[in-house]
Amino acid sequence: INHILNSDKHLNKNVSIYGWVRTFRANRFIALNDGSCLNNIQCVVDFEKTEQEILKKITTGAALNIKGKVVESQGSQQSIEIMVDKCEILGGSNPEVYPIQPKKHSFEFLRENAHLRTRTNTFSAVMRIRSNLSFAIHEYFKKNGFYYVHTPIITASDAEGAGEQFRVSTLDMKNPPLNNYGQ
């Protein structure tokens, strides 16, 4: 969605996009977001040509694959929109229980729904920033001759009693160094 919104090369061309429904207004306008940018892309559905069963399943939080043509928008809120040729429901969402609505939620509320919080503007922005920072750091070190090494992870967890904890130390535990007092 980010590439489509920020480039004219898709104008008057057919595209296929995936995302989650932020809003669905008047059985016609879908605001779709995939987390790649803050803005939603408006998808215009011809409700006379679209099956009623599909229209009923387009609810906030539903995952869709939209195929259609990118055109200049008739409205003033966005510069382009997608005229939907085909809409496929990849994952439904029950509007009665889907907790993320098009409003601002508290961080406490989002902690309680951690599996969905990346669908909010705040957390998707944090994810994009972290991704760009990590990439920049890795790129810097790569350009300066460093290697990225996956070190072993040593943890204190014992899954199902199948192992025993062991101590990792640089000291000789049978003959530890003593201080001036013999301790």
Describe the residue ranges of each PLM region:
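Class II aminoacyl-tRNA synthetase catalytic cores and aaRS-like
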Residues: 1-183
